[in-house]
Amino acid sequence: MASRQAYKRLSKEYKMMTENPPPYIVAAPKEDNILVWHYVITGPPETPYEDGQYHGTLVFPNDYPFNPPAIRMLTPNGRFRENTRLCLSMSDYHPDTWNPSWSVATILTGLLSFMTTDESSIGTMESTDSTKRKYAAKSKEHNATRSPIFCQIFPELAEQNRRDIEEAKKRKDETVVEDEHPFKQEQVVSLEEINDPEDRIRAQMLQQPAGNGTTSNSIGRSLLFVLFSLAALLVAVCYTRV
């Protein structure tokens, strides 16, 4: 249970976080326990975490602000181990370096700053920038579909995540349909635009209904006549050259 001083201080900080949150950060306490906070960090631009969404917790001692909180990150991210206490200068690993004037905003801003470096500590892990980007791309889906507590604490973010996922799925489906039909529909050409007699007869045959046998036979005879005429013309040309 929070001490009176801790409750008063954290209530004030919640109001400050609501009215003036730090860049890329939102945070809120649980309704039934003001000592347990949940935060969401949005990956800043030009970093491997860009557009990622990282959910974690701050668990404050009942004598806060005289001692620091435990800090964890729950969303897979490639930088910190999931649901593991992090050893940072403003975490409960280092009460000796803690400053009571620091706040929730100070703690989370420091966490974001440390996240974008390559410094190692207890709770950190090594991974490539490519791996971090893959985690960033999957983070919203993870939070919206695999983290009930995220959906409970941040219902608006969870709903927005679901909409984003649905939109991305629609765009992917549309791309697949376009790939399956890579050729545009052929332009229809009228018979009057066909100059070659043989091509015109073929076009007429294609336009006739399948059951019209009489017309098909007539066109067939016409086609044969054209072919014989062309053959005779070729023979005559060859004979003339000889």
From Swiss-Prot:
CDD domains in UniProt: UBCc_UBE2J (cd23799)
Reaction equations catalysed: S-ubiquitinyl-[E1 ubiquitin-activating enzyme]-L-cysteine + [E2 ubiquitin-conjugating enzyme]-L-cysteine = [E1 ubiquitin-activating enzyme]-L-cysteine + S-ubiquitinyl-[E2 ubiquitin-conjugating enzyme]-L-cysteine
Record EC number: 2.3.2.23
Primary localization: endoplasmic reticulum
Involved pathway(s): Protein modification; protein ubiquitination
Cell compartment(s), UniProt: Endoplasmic reticulum membrane
Pfam families (UniProt xref): UQ_con
Spans through the membrane: 218-240
Active site residues according to the UniProt entry: 87
One example of a Gene Ontology biological process annotation: protein ubiquitination
GO cellular component: endoplasmic reticulum membrane
Family per similarity comment: Belongs to the ubiquitin-conjugating enzyme family.
Name of this protein: Ubiquitin-conjugating enzyme E2 6
Organism: Eremothecium gossypii (strain ATCC 10895 / CBS 109.51 / FGSC 9923 / NRRL Y-1056)
Lineage: Eukaryota, Fungi, Dikarya, Ascomycota, Saccharomycotina
